[in-house]
Amino acid sequence: MLSPERPSDVPRRTVLTVGGVGLGALLTGLASSPAFAVDTATATVPAEQAATSAAFPVPDSAGIPPGPAPFGWNPVDLLDFDPATLPWAKHLRCLVPRATRIEPFAPTQAHPDLDPAVQLSTLTRYDAGSVYGARPQPIGLEPWAYTQRYWQYIDVWGTWHGVVSHLTPDELVAKPSGTAGRQGAVIDLPDPQWVEAAHLNGARAIGGWFWPRGGVDFNGFLVQREDGSFPVGDKLVEIRDYFGFDGLFINQEASITATQVGKLKELFRYIKRIDPDFYLQYYDAVLPSTGSLSYQNVLNERNVPWLGTPEEPVMDSVFINYGWYSGPDPHLTTSATTARAHGFDPRQVAFAGVEHQKGIFNPSERFGAVAGPGTPAPTSVGLFVDNQFWWTKALSGEAASIEGRAGLRDLEQRFWSGPTGDPHTSGRTVAFSSGRQDVWNYQRFDGVAHWITERSPYGALPIVSSFNVGSGAGFWLGGVQVRDSGWNNQGSADRALSWQYWSEGDLAVRLDETVAYEGGHSLALTGSGVLHLFKTDLTAKGRMPVRVHAQGLTSVEVGVTWRDAPDAVDWHPLVGVELGGWRTWGTSLRLDGRRVARISLRTEGDGHLGKVAFLAAPGVDRPSRAEGFTVSDAGDVKAAEGTRHLSFEWQLADGADAYDVLQVGTEGVTWLGRVRRDVFFAESVDLTRGRLFTVRAIGRDGSYSAPVHARLA
């Protein structure tokens, strides 16, 4: 059900022919070139540009999304889990393995004296800005929904908010939050788009366990067989394996009996025994000996038993409640001492909670007092609702327009990179006074980059980025606009840049949603200077082809920082060729087996950076075709005649990193979506534009397979 404040018209998927380029040129060109094929004049500003706060999408107002949607479980339905009978199960899987991150290398850190052992966990509102709160929509038409682009700092991402059980009647799910019977489930399946994005960047992604929940018998979780196994434990491991996430955040926040808490510990110990990679983080709430709710605000002898022992763990870590700074452990030394006394590394097992849901840029917890460049933190840190700024602003309509989202992306940059927006100059510029006051003043917050070193998955070539953050008001392929309406799918985003944005000289950088080379965004550059892009650990004996697509720039150079000479940057000029509205800059660098520790660009002129690629070899590593491509009708759209929901399936292709699905019409093609699995649900497809569809596999170097077609009967 739509809120009366939300526009009732269905977002359009317009077929475009841009700069005279139609179906043949687009598909043939993209299939024959490694990531950089069709270049044409810049397209029109997307239709989303005109959105205003007068009629905006109201967060958590629309009930159940069409098609796939993650949900929650309680014991009665958890034990009945069977993917063969679960609607849309294949659409909720993450097939992306968790990337390996390179080892720390201090000379190329934004802060060389920042301790890389300090970790970061987050509890993030998965639905910030989305109209779907009861059950999130993994792929949708919502450019106003938040997507994370600072994965380089996150070690453990956790879902927050709570989703409604799939056994709850639809009419109740569609009711406002708090309605009697609209009950959140105990165990939340994490939204697969978040899991995919986390894994691409080497982070863990965990679901949620939320207690109390009304109408649920807690003892149902604690049933134990005679052989010592737990049916719920077996089923949780099965579910994690099928859906591809990494574990659970245990928010056990109501007292239970001593007998129950003893069984609960045994359940978690059993899970860790049969699946050591099942990551469990416990919130500092219920005590492990008595079952009583008692926030300790410190890791101490009362709650440390939740960790078990190094040889037989119960939990992997504890999220320490927020009262540590004004309470028993202001310097976190007691927590660190307790962890070490029990054989644990405190940075691995103790995460000091910081409450951003209320504090935003000025939380009461001052982790920066015990952490920062030159100050090794005793423990790691956990952020509660790091994206609260987006949720709050979305409630007043600020996320509904491109201009509004630009402001929110700027706030996001200040949150993660510090008040200057540059991670190598992070650190608060206004002294701390009282927490949870003046919460929108970003000068009061250090920025996460002041506490946590950037992590990197860039240990091998190719490295390709078009600065796609997994949402946008339009979509472009090769400089051609092939969609002029909004979309979101965080799982389709590129891997995060290592720094956003570490620049030198008078260069200013911002994320721009009005134009792109591929995806939904580009980087707008003003002035001249250096932009550091990727922290790497690369070794190659041959050459590294370099390709850069940009508009308006008069000069582009690529800079290599060698690991054996980290104090200097080795600069190489790129040669540009004008093709329509984008200039392709390129060169080929000889690496000769030396280790590359960082890749940077030096530019002159105002313009846009659309795509960068650092390739493994001169040839194209094209993926195989996505065979077995089919399309089926998945339901009508009541608000628009001739518009249908569609479901697509195909076989995974060798060498494929992702897949683009497009609609083919007489006027051109329309991009429907990009996914990293073998199924795709497309919402609200206008069939008057055509009933022929195509899928193309995309390789790691950005090259495209030959298209495979299917027609809707």
Regions found by a protein language model. Name each.
Residues D113-T334:
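Chitinase-like catalytic core of GlcNAc-active glycosidases
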Residues M1-V10, G19-V38:
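N-terminal secretory signal peptides
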Residues P46-L141, A145-Q148:
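N-terminal module-boundary/linker segments of secreted carbohydrate-active enzymes
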Residues V480, G486, G491, L523, ...:
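Extra-cytoplasmic beta-strand recognition segments
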